[in-house]
Amino acid sequence: MASNLLKALIRSQILPSSRRNFSVATTQLGIPTDDLVGNHTAKWMQDRSKKSPMELISEVPPIKVDGRIVACEGDTNPALGHPIEFICLDLNEPAICKYCGLRYVQDHHH
């Protein structure tokens, strides 16, 4: 009995429908990801007239840097920031800090 339950659990984790993919423009239900940014946190906020933190962070334009690696601390004041995260900017699209959500892009001088 327990082995059948374990097999079913393992099988359900392997199915592609149970995987989450955030790199696409729409969800599996066809909802644009931009709608999720506005609605996800807003449902937990008491004052819905204000913008959610996810909406505020998405309005900040990507920060252009010269090098390939950027060190994100979240704020200029270390007491208000987060642990330092080194982000590699090898891709053409902006890289996102996992703590604060700031986006960084390499500034190509071509």
Swiss-Prot record:
GO annotations of cellular component type: mitochondrial inner membrane; mitochondrion
InterPro entries tied to this protein: NDUFS6, Znf_CHCC
Domain of life: Eukaryota
The protein's name: NADH dehydrogenase [ubiquinone] iron-sulfur protein 6, mitochondrial
Location (main, coarse): mitochondrion
Organism: Arabidopsis thaliana
Location of the transit peptide in the chain: 1-22
One Pfam family cited in the UniProt record for this chain: zf-CHCC
Role description: Accessory subunit of the mitochondrial membrane respiratory chain NADH dehydrogenase (Complex I), that is believed not to be involved in catalysis. Complex I functions in the transfer of electrons from NADH to the respiratory chain. The immediate electron acceptor for the enzyme is believed to be ubiquinone.
Signal peptide: none
Membrane topology designation: Peripheral membrane protein
Classification via PANTHER family: NADH DEHYDROGENASE [UBIQUINONE] IRON-SULFUR PROTEIN 6, MITOCHONDRIAL, NADH-UBIQUINONE OXIDOREDUCTASE 13 KD-A SUBUNIT
Keywords: Electron transport, Membrane, Mitochondrion, Mitochondrion inner membrane, Respiratory chain, Transit peptide, Transport
Assembly and binders: Complex I is composed of at least 49 different subunits. This is a component of the iron-sulfur (IP) fragment of the enzyme.
Gene Ontology BP terms: mitochondrial electron transport, NADH to ubiquinone
UniProt xrefs under Gene3D superfamilies: q5lls5 like domains
Subcellular location field: Mitochondrion inner membrane
Family in the record: Belongs to the complex I NDUFS6 subunit family.
